[in-house]
Amino acid sequence: MGDGWLPPDCGPHNRSGGGGATAAPTGSRQVSAELLSQQWEAGMSLLMALVVLLIVAGNVLVIAAIGRTQRLQTLTNLFITSLACADLVMGLLVVPFGATLVVRGTWLWGSFLCECWTSLDVLCVTASIETLCVIAIDRYLAITSPFRYQSLMTRARAKVIICTVWAISALVSFLPIMMHWWRDEDPQALKCYQDPGCCDFVTNRAYAIASSIISFYIPLLIMIFVYLRVYREAKEQIRKIDRCEGRFYGSQEQPQPPPLPQHQPILGNGRASKRKTSRVMAMREHKALKTLGIIMGVFTLCWLPFFLVNIVNVFNRDLVPDWLFVFFNWLGYANSAFNPIIYCRSPDFRKAFKRLLCFPRKADRRLHAGGQPAPLPGGFISTLGSPEHSPGGTWSDCNGGTRGGSESSLEERHSKTSRSESKMEREKNILATTRFYCTFLGNGDKAVFCTVLRIVKLFEDATCTCPHTHKLKMKWRFKQHQA
């Protein structure tokens, strides 16, 4: 979707003015122009190389993390993988050639490769944007119908959806471009088509409007509608839980036999717990809004300007300067670098990234010495971050983990004890909230429990089938620690 952009003519023009002003020598003007042109090329090359590096590194990391971490191989992450593949192809085969076209100001590889490059550009852009739309619909179904989602969205259906997205993208890109359905009859456009050094994507009105609607405007409208519904559903479910929670803590204030001292901190004072949980609900609502705002804000900021000028350009080619069109096009390319950051913000992804970047074998040995389960043959623990593990010895950073046996120092033991106590304090709050969900919500309202989990972890699957089991496991862990 890119146009060529010639470097600016930096040399001064010859002028003859009154008053006997003399022009600078021609040789000095040429040297100055060449020097400025070289500086411009060096600066643009460095900037575009940075964009390519960010796109490739980020998406390779996402694909490797999902492929090598069993915990991340979920249905939603199938769509994330498809998105990362589209962005990776963009970073490897589209953006570098576009950077060469911008820096050199001419196409170096002939007309046929120009059409192939343009087709690949449109293919990756369309696949990336439509996959973002599919992810939005997937999260909408998971949040609004959590139990129905389990049977509605299977792995086979997810693969069919991904293949459909790529097929639609190919129909919008390769078919019309290679068949020359996109070409215009404008004399300036015809001159570009006949020049092997020109690779400007000058299209007719029908193709520009149709491709923009299919590739961007329809997905944009769907994403706006879906994410508005997701946020409204989030607020409604949080209010519903808050109302039920009031009844729950009201019942806790009735006279009860005094508990044993060591069991007293589990639920604490009813009113204080209610205020604390209300604050937690407000924080979750804020986090959901923040996540949705980041998703829609970055996507719209990156692609809306380009697709607006893409429509305007076919009606009046002189209205939008070439440099502005190219800038908006590269702003859209930058979205491929932002996607891994936005859609892989979960703790599971961050842990997988750390394992990939920080010598995983060494990290596995430290985890094993710290009391974690033995790693699988692939070198990764299948239940990374699972609540069933013992409280101590969690892997938190690249240099984390503790050394067992007689080599452990007193300071390390104290540090491990502090981490365990801090984790147990968090589990007390989780236990109280989970007990409330499982005991005081009826069968129909258990979906609320799953909904809140999916709202807070918007792009992770949450276990929704047996919250009672989760409660019992955490309760058993607490009693084991107290013993």
Swiss-Prot record:
Q: How does it sit in the membrane?
A: Multi-pass membrane protein
Q: What SUPFAM superfamilies has UniProt attached to this entry?
A: Family A G protein-coupled receptor-like (SSF81321)
This chain's source organism reads Meleagris gallopavo
Q: Residue spans with biased composition (Basic and acidic residues)?
A: 410-425
> Which GO terms of the cellular component aspect does the record hold?
early endosome; membrane; plasma membrane
The alphabetized list of GO BP terms reads: adenylate cyclase-activating adrenergic receptor signaling pathway; norepinephrine-epinephrine-mediated vasodilation involved in regulation of systemic arterial blood pressure; positive regulation of heart contraction; positive regulation of MAPK cascade; regulation of circadian sleep/wake cycle, sleep
Segments crossing the lipid bilayer? 39-67, 77-103, 116-137, 156-179, 206-231, 286-315, 321-343
Which residue ranges does the entry give as Cytoplasmic-facing topology?
68-76, 138-155, 232-285, 344-483
Protein name in the entry: Beta-1 adrenergic receptor
Q: Which residues form a coiled coil?
A: none
Q: Where is this region: Disordered?
A: 1-26, 250-270, 387-425
Chief subcellular site?
membrane
Pfam families recorded: 7tm_1
Entry's SMART domains? Answer: 7TM_GPCR_Srsx (SM01381)
Q: Which residues bear S-palmitoyl cysteine-type lipidation?
A: 358
Q: State the protein's purpose.
A: Beta-adrenergic receptors mediate the catecholamine-induced activation of adenylate cyclase through the action of G proteins. This receptor binds epinephrine and norepinephrine with approximately equal affinity. In dorsal pons neurons, involved in the regulation of sleep/wake behaviors.
- Keywords of this entry: Cell membrane, Disulfide bond, Endosome, G-protein coupled receptor, Glycoprotein, Lipoprotein, Membrane, Palmitate, Phosphoprotein, Receptor, Transducer, Transmembrane, Transmembrane helix
MF-aspect GO terms: beta1-adrenergic receptor activity; identical protein binding
Q: Which amino acids does the record list as binding cyanopindolol?
A: 121, 211, 329
Q: Which gene encodes it?
A: ADRB1
Q: Which family does it belong to?
A: Belongs to the G-protein coupled receptor 1 family. Adrenergic receptor subfamily. ADRB1 sub-subfamily.
Disulfide-bond pairs as recorded: 114-199, 192-198
Cellular compartments annotated: Cell membrane; Early endosome
What kind of modification does the protein receive after translation? Answer: Homologous desensitization of the receptor is mediated by its phosphorylation by beta-adrenergic receptor kinase.
**Which InterPro entries does the entry link to?**
ADR_fam (IPR002233), ADRB1_rcpt (IPR000507), GPCR_Rhodpsn (IPR000276), GPCR_Rhodpsn_7TM (IPR017452)
Q: Which PROSITE patterns match?
A: G_PROTEIN_RECEP_F1_1, G_PROTEIN_RECEP_F1_2
